[in-house]
Protein backbone atom coordinates (compact mmCIF):
# COMPACT_ATOMS: atom_id res chain seq x y z
CA UNK A 1 0.00 0.00 0.00
CA UNK A 2 1.04 3.59 -0.51
CA UNK A 3 0.34 7.01 0.96
CA UNK A 4 -1.22 9.20 -1.73
CA UNK A 5 -0.89 12.97 -2.07
CA UNK A 6 -4.05 14.80 -0.94
CA UNK A 7 -5.00 17.81 -3.06
CA UNK A 8 -5.66 21.02 -1.15
CA UNK A 9 -8.14 23.79 -1.87
CA UNK A 10 -8.05 25.89 -4.09
CA UNK A 11 -6.56 23.24 -6.43
CA UNK A 12 -8.92 23.21 -9.45
CA UNK A 13 -8.67 19.40 -9.73
CA UNK A 14 -10.93 19.19 -6.67
CA UNK A 15 -13.72 20.59 -8.86
CA UNK A 16 -13.64 17.73 -11.38
CA UNK A 17 -16.61 15.38 -11.54
CA UNK A 18 -15.67 11.77 -10.89
CA UNK A 19 -16.40 9.10 -13.49
CA UNK A 20 -18.14 5.81 -12.66
CA UNK A 21 -15.96 2.76 -12.15
CA UNK A 22 -16.56 0.34 -15.04
CA UNK A 23 -15.28 -2.76 -13.21
CA UNK A 24 -14.00 -3.42 -9.70
CA UNK A 25 -10.61 -4.87 -10.58
CA UNK A 26 -7.18 -5.09 -8.91
CA UNK A 27 -6.39 -1.45 -9.68
CA UNK A 28 -9.60 -0.23 -8.01
CA UNK A 29 -9.00 -2.46 -4.97
CA UNK A 30 -5.44 -1.12 -4.71
CA UNK A 31 -6.74 2.43 -5.02
CA UNK A 32 -9.23 1.80 -2.20
CA UNK A 33 -6.52 0.25 -0.01
CA UNK A 34 -4.14 3.15 -0.69
CA UNK A 35 -6.91 5.64 0.03
CA UNK A 36 -7.66 3.98 3.38
CA UNK A 37 -3.99 4.08 4.33
CA UNK A 38 -3.78 7.73 3.28
CA UNK A 39 -6.95 8.61 5.21
CA UNK A 40 -5.73 6.89 8.39
CA UNK A 41 -2.32 8.55 8.14
CA UNK A 42 -3.78 12.05 7.55
CA UNK A 43 -5.74 11.42 9.94
CA UNK A 44 -9.32 11.62 8.70
CA UNK A 45 -12.59 9.69 8.61
CA UNK A 46 -13.39 9.95 4.91
CA UNK A 47 -11.64 10.39 1.57
CA UNK A 48 -12.85 10.56 -2.03
CA UNK A 49 -10.66 9.50 -4.97
CA UNK A 50 -10.98 13.01 -6.43
CA UNK A 51 -9.04 14.27 -3.39
CA UNK A 52 -6.05 12.12 -4.39
CA UNK A 53 -6.23 13.22 -8.03
CA UNK A 54 -8.11 10.15 -9.30
CA UNK A 55 -11.44 11.27 -10.83
CA UNK A 56 -13.23 7.96 -10.16
CA UNK A 57 -16.34 7.32 -8.07
CA UNK A 58 -14.55 5.71 -5.13
CA UNK A 59 -14.97 6.76 -1.49
CA UNK A 60 -13.49 5.32 1.71
CA UNK A 61 -14.83 6.00 5.20
CA UNK A 62 -14.09 4.78 8.70
CA UNK A 63 -15.77 6.57 11.59
CA UNK A 64 -14.64 4.00 14.20
CA UNK A 65 -12.28 5.14 16.96
CA UNK A 66 -9.88 2.24 16.36
CA UNK A 67 -9.85 2.17 12.53
CA UNK A 68 -11.63 -1.19 12.57
CA UNK A 69 -14.62 -0.51 10.31
CA UNK A 70 -13.43 0.59 6.87
CA UNK A 71 -16.20 1.17 4.35
CA UNK A 72 -15.46 1.28 0.62
CA UNK A 73 -18.17 2.75 -1.61
CA UNK A 74 -17.78 2.42 -5.38
CA UNK A 75 -20.21 4.23 -7.69
CA UNK A 76 -22.26 5.36 -4.67
CA UNK A 77 -25.67 6.95 -5.12
CA UNK A 78 -27.93 8.39 -2.46
CA UNK A 79 -31.42 7.11 -3.26
CA UNK A 80 -33.33 8.52 -0.26
CA UNK A 81 -32.90 11.43 2.16
CA UNK A 82 -34.93 12.27 5.23
CA UNK A 83 -34.90 15.13 7.72
CA UNK A 84 -32.22 17.73 8.36
CA UNK A 85 -29.27 17.76 10.74
CA UNK A 86 -26.49 20.25 11.31
CA UNK A 87 -23.03 19.11 12.33
CA UNK A 88 -19.52 20.50 12.28
CA UNK A 89 -17.46 19.32 9.33
CA UNK A 90 -13.85 19.50 8.30
CA UNK A 91 -12.04 18.26 5.21
CA UNK A 92 -8.58 16.87 4.49
CA UNK A 93 -8.52 19.05 1.35
CA UNK A 94 -9.41 22.20 3.31
CA UNK A 95 -7.13 21.94 6.37
CA UNK A 96 -7.84 23.78 9.62
CA UNK A 97 -11.41 24.78 8.70
CA UNK A 98 -14.27 23.38 10.77
CA UNK A 99 -17.77 24.77 10.30
CA UNK A 100 -21.38 23.61 10.71
CA UNK A 101 -23.13 22.27 7.60
CA UNK A 102 -26.79 21.23 7.28
CA UNK A 103 -27.41 17.95 5.47
CA UNK A 104 -30.00 15.18 5.42
CA UNK A 105 -30.32 13.49 8.82
CA UNK A 106 -30.88 10.03 7.35
CA UNK A 107 -29.91 8.60 3.98
CA UNK A 108 -30.09 5.40 1.98
CA UNK A 109 -27.17 4.79 -0.36
CA UNK A 110 -26.63 2.17 -3.07
CA UNK A 111 -23.04 1.27 -3.95
CA UNK A 112 -20.63 -1.48 -4.91
CA UNK A 113 -18.34 -2.77 -2.17
CA UNK A 114 -14.62 -3.55 -2.51
CA UNK A 115 -15.52 -6.92 -4.04
CA UNK A 116 -17.88 -5.38 -6.60
CA UNK A 117 -21.04 -6.59 -4.84
CA UNK A 118 -24.15 -4.37 -4.84
CA UNK A 119 -24.97 -3.03 -1.39
CA UNK A 120 -27.61 -0.84 0.23
CA UNK A 121 -26.96 1.07 3.43
CA UNK A 122 -29.45 3.03 5.51
CA UNK A 123 -27.70 5.29 7.97
CA UNK A 124 -27.88 8.45 10.03
CA UNK A 125 -25.81 10.76 12.23
CA UNK A 126 -22.05 10.90 11.62
CA UNK A 127 -21.92 8.18 8.95
CA UNK A 128 -24.74 9.83 6.96
CA UNK A 129 -22.96 13.20 7.18
CA UNK A 130 -19.64 11.68 6.14
CA UNK A 131 -21.14 9.85 3.15
CA UNK A 132 -22.88 13.01 1.94
CA UNK A 133 -19.66 15.02 2.36
CA UNK A 134 -17.60 12.51 0.39
CA UNK A 135 -20.22 12.12 -2.35
CA UNK A 136 -20.15 15.90 -2.79
CA UNK A 137 -16.46 15.50 -3.71
CA UNK A 138 -17.46 13.14 -6.51
CA UNK A 139 -19.52 16.01 -7.96
CA UNK A 140 -16.70 18.54 -7.62
CA UNK A 141 -18.35 20.15 -4.61
CA UNK A 142 -16.60 21.08 -1.35
CA UNK A 143 -18.19 21.58 2.05
CA UNK A 144 -17.18 25.24 1.93
CA UNK A 145 -19.61 25.67 -0.98
CA UNK A 146 -22.36 25.67 1.67
CA UNK A 147 -20.86 28.83 3.24
CA UNK A 148 -21.54 32.48 2.44
CA UNK A 149 -19.54 34.15 -0.34
CA UNK A 150 -17.65 36.26 2.21
CA UNK A 151 -16.67 33.23 4.29
CA UNK A 152 -15.52 31.33 1.16
CA UNK A 153 -13.39 34.31 0.10
CA UNK A 154 -11.69 34.40 3.51
CA UNK A 155 -11.02 30.66 3.37
CA UNK A 156 -9.59 30.97 -0.15
CA UNK A 157 -7.21 33.76 0.91
CA UNK A 158 -6.09 31.71 3.91
CA UNK A 159 -5.54 28.64 1.69
CA UNK A 160 -3.57 30.64 -0.89
CA UNK A 161 -1.38 32.10 1.87
CA UNK A 162 -0.76 28.61 3.27
CA UNK A 163 0.26 27.42 -0.22
CA UNK A 164 2.72 30.32 -0.63
CA UNK A 165 4.28 29.62 2.76
CA UNK A 166 4.68 25.90 2.06
CA UNK A 167 6.13 26.38 -1.45
Swiss-Prot record:
Entry keyword set: Hydrolase, Iron, Metal-binding, Protein biosynthesis
Keyword S-adenosyl-L-methionine recorded: no
Pfam families noted in UniProt: Pep_deformylase
Superkingdom per UniProt: Bacteria
Cofactor section: Fe(2+)
GO biological process, one term: translation
CDD domains named among the record's database cross-references: Pep_deformylase
Active-site residues per Swiss-Prot or TrEMBL entry: 134
EC number(s) reported in the record: 3.5.1.88
Catalytic reaction annotation: N-terminal N-formyl-L-methionyl-[peptide] + H2O = N-terminal L-methionyl-[peptide] + formate
Amino acids binding Fe cation: 91, 133, 137
A molecular function GO annotation: metal ion binding
Repeat listed as a keyword: no
Family statement drawn from the similarity comment of this UniProt entry: Belongs to the polypeptide deformylase family.
NCBIfam families tied to this protein: pept_deformyl (TIGR00079), PRK00150.1-3 (NF001159)
Known function: Removes the formyl group from the N-terminal Met of newly synthesized proteins. Requires at least a dipeptide for an efficient rate of reaction. N-terminal L-methionine is a prerequisite for activity but the enzyme has broad specificity at other positions.
Protein name: Peptide deformylase
Underlying gene: def
